[in-house]
Amino acid sequence: MKFSKKNIFLLLLIFHQPIKSEINLSDSDLFKTLTSHIYLKATFNQQTLSQGILRQVEGKIFASREGKFRIEYLEPLNEVFISKGNQLIKYDPLLEQLEIFPASYLLSQGIVNLISLDLYSLEKYFQIVSCNEIATKSSCKIIPRNKESFIKSAEIYLQKNLLNKIIFIDNFEQQVIISFKDLSHHFFEDTIFEFEAPIGTDVIYHSKDLQ
């Protein structure tokens, strides 16, 4: 079953870094912790529950605090999302189609900003509602300040001070669960954010300014 475009952008995950053990989440230092690492690389599993139907997809994510990210979905989507901060591109190999969105589109996506915005921007676009810690597990609930965001709320879960999963509810009352593994914050080359569509690919611009 094909994922809707809005649902795909929602997942853009949220992917992020470990919480330092000396930081108490109840002190609302979550955003400082999220921005304490420049690079993030991980694999993920996304489950979407909508009207009793469960859909799953796996993928890989690369992200940089310089406003860049790359998300690669495996079967059945096989889609690629890349942003260098100035625009967002989506490539669908099955449709042989490349879509280009303006940077302003990213701000409405909510969760995707957690992987690329700086501390000032995170505090501007998100609000921490509450945080809880039990033994080696902790979680924080956040909500977007932007009323046009596609999400209503999100819960960030950590285990042994590492990002474990994120659960969020979108404006269509769908529950999305993103589980992470093989998380790394090691340096990687910016070439991962480069993309050149195959010859013959249809290109769709979602803003006249991008043409």
Region roles according to the model:
Residues 23-48, 54, 91-152, 209:
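Flexible, processing/modification-adjacent segments and terminal tails
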Residues 39-51, 60-62, 68-72:
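N-terminal secretory signal peptides
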Residues 42-44, 69-73, 88-91, 142, ...:
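Short hydrophobic/aromatic-rich beta-strand segments that constitute the beta-sheet cores
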Residues 60-110, 173-177:
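An acidic-aromatic
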